[in-house]
């Protein structure tokens, strides 16, 4: 069946071996999985968030810190039975608080099949849809059963930046529509992440302004200072440097000015704040693919 899961709507017949923009194939590919304690507090609880890092991505961020698996496709193809085993172990052995689907969009049909199998066994946990925000509302509607929590980015407020930095046409309208869908569906279960990018703090502020005006300043926001130059960003100004303290403070001050009271900031200048949300800082006891 032609794939139209993401906004690109490539219509690649993946079951027959064709691939689209994301290069995802006919089977789910996973890079790493396990309990993760670096997510936002409501998702972590006592036993951590059960993160499953899927390979491939619907965007191509030139500064991607996860490029080995998002761009390069590192990971292992697995059957739905194997994928179900991962989710079962996370729930029953690790006793995680939720199943955290990191960049799941190309593999949603397989994840749903896994969920149905586990539900038949009496195994149920909330799903976290952990995404860049570059999602079709039609796909969100179709797979809403996999979105108990929406952990969505608002990365850009200008499409020209999104196209240059992430090869994501129409990102602004698309990500805002996704955030609006999640907010209207369940106001208790949306967290918006805003990664402050070097030279683009004004876009983070514009995203906050849109949230406050079009949704609500009650939306929980996670303001992230962790940007670190990586991959092609190391050769592409202004992405070849970190965020300055002045840039980050301008965003946190704007959040206060807009009346946001729910959410989190990252300590600027703390020891390795950049690691707080990265998969490579997660315990790899049973999730590393060599």
Residue ranges and their predicted role:
Residues 1-18, 187-189, 194-290:
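Auxiliary Fe-S-binding modules of radical SAM enzymes
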Residues 2-58, 62, 66-71, 279, ...:
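N-terminal [4Fe-4S]-dependent radical SAM core
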Residues 84-238:
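Conserved AdoMet/S-adenosylmethionine-binding subsite of the radical SAM
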Residues 30-50, 85-104, 265:
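Short Fe-S-cluster ligation motifs
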Residues 79, 106, 270-271:
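Positions that flank functional sites
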Residues 55, 60-97:
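Glycine-rich active-site/cofactor-binding loop and its immediate structural neighborhood
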Residues 55, 77, 130, 241-242:
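Residue-level marker of alpha-helix boundaries and capping positions
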